[in-house]
Amino acid sequence: MSRKYEYAQKLYDEGDFKRANRLYEQIAPQFVGKPQGERVMFFFANSYFEIGDYNVAGYQFERFLKSYPRSDKAAEAAFLGAKSYYMLSPKYSLDQTDTDKALTKLQLFINAYPESEYTVEANAMARELTTKKEQKAFEIAKQFVKLGEYFVLDYNLSGIAALDNFVNDYPGSVYREEALFQKFRAASNLAINSTFRKRKERLDEAVEAYNNLMKDYPETEFAKDAEKLLEDIQEELNKYTELENLAK
């Protein structure tokens, strides 16, 4: 057993993580409770990380932390465990379950080890994953607005609700400016295509959406498109007033 342990360590030190992993898998159970057990268990977990088997790496680092919570390697293990789940996070358009798990693990690490040498990297990874989640939520909301051009009522209402939720959930998002513009766009399309009974209220809501955009982003890159939409809204408001006067 001692020879296998030494050879596994040699392979690990040489960067042959795949062969080292196979040996650690054989010997790890025999080292439970022994002085070398902590070292074996850490390198066993990290060998999975190094060969790109991040699911198992995350699990093994969790086992290590449960077995050796006071280890000198605890912070590194917690970071690498969180990073394992970070590596599993897919592109924004796919299911973000692994992204959610990675964010949870990263936040737990940051809270537990705020002064760790790995905290800066952990914060950067957390920001990246948060941006990915923001992008997914924003693209879904934007898709509603696009569909609202063809199916006015339901999709514009859904788009407005989704964009409101997005702005509330991610107030500091890099997509916030466009989200406010897209809300104005959806509100305008909904208002212009509304029944006479609901048109005035929705036209006013569209103007409010425009004002919110310009209040927060007076130099918005969407100014030209927003002003064109506002002209359409003002024209519809004038028509509404004329029709209302005729009806008196």
Outline where the language-model segments fall:
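Acidic, polar-rich low-complexity tracts and alpha-helical solenoid repeat scaffolds
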Residues: 1-248
